C-alpha cells in the first residue's frame, strides 16, 4: 500500500463518525435515479468505495442487489450498520470484484487514487461489468493532485476525464456532467461526473 493510500485510509478511520454525519444529508437522489435508469430492474451494483453506505442503502431500497466495499475499516462498519450488507474491507487495488455487474457506482471514491494508477484500477473494475454496463465516477472539479488535509485528492476537469476514460480499454464515455456539491452548505464546491459504459468491442488508445 502506498503512503497516500495509507494516510487517506487513516483519515477515514479516525474521522468516520464526523464524515458519516457530514454526508448523511447529501441530496443524491437525482444522480442515483439517473444511474438506476441505466440498469435493468433488480440488477447488480458494485458500490466502489461505499463510505457510509448511504448510496448502497438507496439502491437496496430501489430493489437492486448491491455489493459494497471500502478501504476504511471504520467506514465498513458504518456501512454495515446502515445497510446490514456484508461490506468488504479492501483497497481498490486488492479487492477482487465478484461480477458481472450491471453497474458500478464510484461516487467520490476514486478521487483518492493517484492519477498514474487510475487507468489500471478503473480498467480492472470495468472488466467486471456486463457488456453495456454503466460505470459512474465522480471527482472534485479541477486539476489539483496531492495531499490535502490528510487525504489524497486527484481532481478532474472535462479534459482530464476524457483522457482518463479514453485510456481504459472497453470503456466509453457518454457524458460529463458538472454539478454543485449536494451536501448542506457546500453548494460552492463543484464536481465532475462521468457517465460511461463498458462495451467489450470498444478499444481505447494507449
Describe each PLM feature range.
Residues 182-206:
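Core SAM-dependent methyltransferase catalytic element
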Residues 145-160, 183-185:
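Acceptor-substrate binding/catalytic loop of class I
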Residues 46, 52-94:
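Class I SAM-dependent methyltransferase SAM/SAH-binding core
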Residues 170-182:
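Conserved S-adenosyl-L-methionine
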Residues 93-104:
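A short acidic, Gly/Pro-enriched loop at the edge of an enzyme's catalytic core
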Residues 1-41:
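Conserved class I S-adenosyl-L-methionine
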Residues 119-131:
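A short glycine-rich, Lys/Arg-flanked "PGG" loop and its adjoining helix->strand segment in the class I
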Residues 132-139:
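Conserved beta-strand signature within the Rossmann-like core of class I S-adenosyl-L-methionine
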Amino acid at each position: 500500500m502506498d503512503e497516500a493510500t495509507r494516510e487517506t485510509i487513516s483519515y477515514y478511520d479516525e474521522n468516520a463518525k464526523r464524515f458519516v454525519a457530514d454526508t448523511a444529508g447529501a441530496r443524491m437522489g437525482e444522480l442515483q435515479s439517473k444511474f438506476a435508469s441505466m440498469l435493468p430492474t433488480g440488477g447488480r451494483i458494485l458500490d466502489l468505495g461505499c463510505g457510509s453506505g448511504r448510496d448502497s442503502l438507496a439502491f437496496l431500497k430501489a430493489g437492486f442487489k448491491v455489493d459494497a466495499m471500502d478501504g476504511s475499516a471504520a467506514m465498513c462498519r458504518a456501512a454495515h450498520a446502515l445497510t446490514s450488507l456484508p461490506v468488504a474491507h479492501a483497497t481498490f487495488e486488492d479487492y477482487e470484484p465478484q461480477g458481472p455487474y450491471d453497474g458500478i457506482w464510484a461516487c467520490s471514491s476514486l478521487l483518492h487514487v493517484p492519477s498514474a494508477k487510475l487507468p489500471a484500477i478503473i480498467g480492472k473494475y470495468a472488466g467486471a461489468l456486463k457488456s453495456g454496463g454503466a460505470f459512474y465516477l465522480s471527482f472534485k472539479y479541477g486539476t489539483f493532485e496531492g495531499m490535502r488535509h490528510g487525504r489524497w485528492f486527484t481532481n478532474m476537469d472535462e479534459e482530464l476525464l476524457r483522457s482518463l476514460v479514453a485510456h481504459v480499454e472497453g470503456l466509453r464515455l457518454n457524458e460529463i456532467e458538472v454539478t454543485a456539491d449536494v451536501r448542506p452548505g457546500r453548494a460552492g464546491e463543484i464536481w465532475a461526473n462521468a457517465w460511461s459504459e463498458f462495451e467489450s468491442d470498444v478499444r481505447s488508445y494507449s
